[in-house]
Amino acid sequence: MAPVKRRVFKTNNEMAVELAKYTADLSSKFCKERGVFTVVLSGGDLIAWLWKLLEAPYIDSIEWSKWHIFWVDERVCAWDHADSNYKLAYDGFLSKVPVPAENIYAIDNGLGAEGNAELAAERYEECLKQKVNQNIIRTYKSSGFPQFDLQLLGMGPDGHMASLFPGHAQINEKVKWVTSITDSPKPPSKRITLTLPVINCASYNVMAVCDKEQADSVAAALNHTKDLPAGRLTADVEVVWFLDQAAASKLPHGWCSIL
């Protein structure tokens, strides 16, 4: 199991500063080592916390042309729909950085508009396998699952991550790379998501949480409570939890220091 680090910040601004530095440092590392940097985004508040990457020194120093962008989960809708994680990321981040359009891998727009969750999941898995064959995505040494360089994740108050929800069968999927959901307890009901083995094969996983509403689930997940999807999070190299004081308020004393 990869080491788990916990970093608690006094303000969201301080967290955004450190998240930008962490991401930029890994970008530099992987661009030098591999010539590409594979990044997996999530929805929710995560995109808003990437704003420091849009400023100096990062906007001009990051090798954006070597980034390849994927999603840990997506709502089954058209790209321009208000529920779309792609739209959220594009409007708030991707439209402001020079990542080549051909390096951005969103859900199939037509299948999203049709609401075909099962086929959309199959197509996205096919896309990932194509990128593995093109040596853009590596595969994990023992399992053959895709291995992304960095995943930027968030967690819901119920402890869900991606579109893996407590009590859902999808959390136990061990073969598929991407699976579909048609009964999400959080609207919209139709989604696709990377499976837990794929999420846990990433080299680096960041979990960013800023809300007192999530404090109980943060404490439970960091205690590796297995009925919470976020409690099963690991990685190949390391997992880092970026938390504000409210989200960390239920952690045992001494588990982490405030930065």
UniProtKB/Swiss-Prot annotation:
Disulfide bonds: none
One GO CC annotation: plant-type vacuole
EC number(s) stated in the UniProt entry for this protein: 3.1.1.31
Pathway participation: Carbohydrate degradation; pentose phosphate pathway; D-ribulose 5-phosphate from D-glucose 6-phosphate (oxidative stage): step 2/3
InterPro entries: 6-phosphogluconolactonase_DevB (IPR005900), Glc/Gal-6P_isomerase (IPR006148), NagB/RpiA_transferase-like (IPR037171), PGLS (IPR039104)
Cellular compartment(s): Cytoplasm, Cytosol
Superkingdom, taxonomy of origin: Eukaryota
GO molecular function: 6-phosphogluconolactonase activity
Keywords: Cytoplasm, Hydrolase
Effects seen without this gene: No visible phenotype under normal growth conditions.
Signal peptide residues on this chain, from the entry's feature table: none
Biological role stated in the UniProt entry: Catalyzes the hydrolysis of 6-phosphogluconolactone to 6-phosphogluconate.
Name this protein carries in UniProt: Probable 6-phosphogluconolactonase 2
Organism: Arabidopsis thaliana (Mouse-ear cress)
